[in-house]
Curated annotation (Swiss-Prot):
Binding site for Mg(2+): 199, 213
Cofactor binding note of this UniProt entry: Binds 1 Mg(2+) ion per subunit.
GO cellular component terms, A-Z: cytosol; succinate-CoA ligase complex
E.C. code: 6.2.1.5
Organism: Rickettsia bellii (strain OSU 85-389)
GO biological process: succinyl-CoA metabolic process; tricarboxylic acid cycle
PANTHER family for the chain: SUCCINATE--COA LIGASE [GDP-FORMING] SUBUNIT BETA, MITOCHONDRIAL, SUCCINYL-COA SYNTHETASE BETA CHAIN
Name of the protein described by the UniProt record: Succinate--CoA ligase [ADP-forming] subunit beta
Keyword Transport: no
PROSITE patterns attached to this UniProt entry: ATP_GRASP, SUCCINYL_COA_LIG_3
Domain of life, per lineage: Bacteria
Length: 385
């Protein structure tokens, strides 16, 4: 789960991380009054959406008067902001965060993430802040600093001190950076976060460190322990199909292609998406129905896939281990009769009760294209659309 920048900063401040402050606007009628609360010479108007690249897309504006700030805020509120992370459809701006500007002497990048490849928490930092860290990693990887934390010992003083020295801080800034490292680590652990990112972390004209932007991503599996974090959820920022799928117990991620996929198992789902690409098409989604799906869940999965108007065909790829192929077949038929599948449908079944499942599909009277293996299935669905 993601939250907005202003919410992330509020959490960081609770843990002692110094951040820039401002006012939140959730409706246009509040804009003027909110800006009047700020006593500053420079105003920063920020669109609050769950996507990066806001600055390049016009979602962050710096102005030098109240009148300009009010005009920019009114113009920005409600627009559809398109960044490299939103996709071409963009994201509607329903919230603004308006801050007092500050003089920046230097920008840094700082984050703490769970590194799955190393199975530990890792700090990532760079002297190149204020830009996409992926761009820095690609062009100047030597400027990326990493410190991994042994889960057996936890964060140690040398981690914090090492990061401060590697970033080139001196004197009181070393102490400030150490405190920021310790505070973000504590926040990461106690909130069950998957990532905390501060970009940029700046040195202001007084020589002090300040988090100018912040991002939190939380581990969905830990949210049941944190009702206060769940309360920060903004469903307007989430894809409605993904929300609907989650409510149905399905793992669904919308993509930009034309072939809908329904698969059991995340690994098989990714392999299915790969082979669709190999045969020259693009998947419209990732959808894992899970190992214990019943007829109703299969039916709901197909309904969700068909709710995407870009879907021109559907590939069902099921390996029946825990799941029975006859149950899948019955769910497909029920969905087809209920909602009327009008796009090509290719079904590949293997495993438990596979012959029974194939027989059910064959006797259904529906236009279902059978496939005997994954390559055959991918070839047939690409040809059919």
């Amino acid at each position: 789960m993601n939250i907005h920048e202003y919410q992330a900063k509020e959490i960081l401040r609770k843990y002692g991380v110094p951040t820039s402050t401002g006012v939140v606007v959730t409706k246009t009628e509040s804009i003027n009054a909110a800006i009047d609360k700020l006593n500053t010479k420079v105003y920063v108007v920020k669109a609050q959406i769950h996507a990066g690249g806001r600055g390049k897309a016009g979602g962050v504006k710096v102005v030098k008067s109240k009148e300009e700030a009010k005009k920019v805020a009114h113009d920005m509120f409600g627009i559809n902001l398109v960044t490299h992370q939103t996709g071409p459809q963009g994201q509607k701006v329903n919230r603004l965060y308006i801050e007092s500007g500050c003089d920046i002497l230097k920008e840094y990048y700082f984050s703490v993430v769970f590194d799955r490849s190393a199975s530990c928490i890792t700090f990532i930092a760079s002297t190149e802040g204020g830009v996409d860290i992926e761009e820095v990693a690609e062009k100047t990887p030597e400027k990326i600093i990493k410190f991994s934390v042994d889960p057996a010992t936890g964060l140690q003083n040398f981690h914090a001190q090492g990061i401060a020295y590697e970033l080139g801080f001196k004197d009181h800034q070393v102490k400030q950076m150490k405190e920021i490292v310790k505070a973000t680590y504590k926040a990461f652990i106690e909130t069950d976060a998957a990532q905390i990112e501060i970009n940029p972390l700046i040195v202001n004209k007084e020589g002090n460190l300040l988090a100018l932007d912040a991002k939190f991503t939380f581990d969905d599996n830990g949210l049941f322990k944190h009702p206060e974090i769940m309360a920060l959820r903004d469903q307007d920022e989430e894809d409605p199909l993904e929300t609907r799928a989650a409510d149905a117990g399905l793992s669904y991620v919308k993509m930009d292609g034309s072939i809908g996929c329904m698969v059991n198992g995340a690994g098989l789902a990714m392999a299915t998406m790969d082979i669709i690409k190999l045969y020259g098409a693009t998947p419209a989604n990732f959808l894992d129905v899970g190992g214990g799906a019943d007829r109703e869940r299969v039916k709901e999965a197909l309904k969700i896939i068909l709710s995407d108007k870009e879907v021109k065909g559907i590939l069902v790829n099921i390996f029946g281990g825990i799941m029975r192929c006859d149950i899948i077949a019955e769910g497909i038929i029920a969905a087809a009769k209920d909602i009327g599948i009008k796009v090509p449908l290719v079904v590949r079944l293997a495993g438990t009760n596979v012959e029974k499942g194939k027989e059910i599909l064959s006797n259904s009277g529906l236009e279902i294209i059978p496939a005997h293996d994954l390559a055959d299935a991918a070839s047939k669905i690409v040809e059919a659309i």
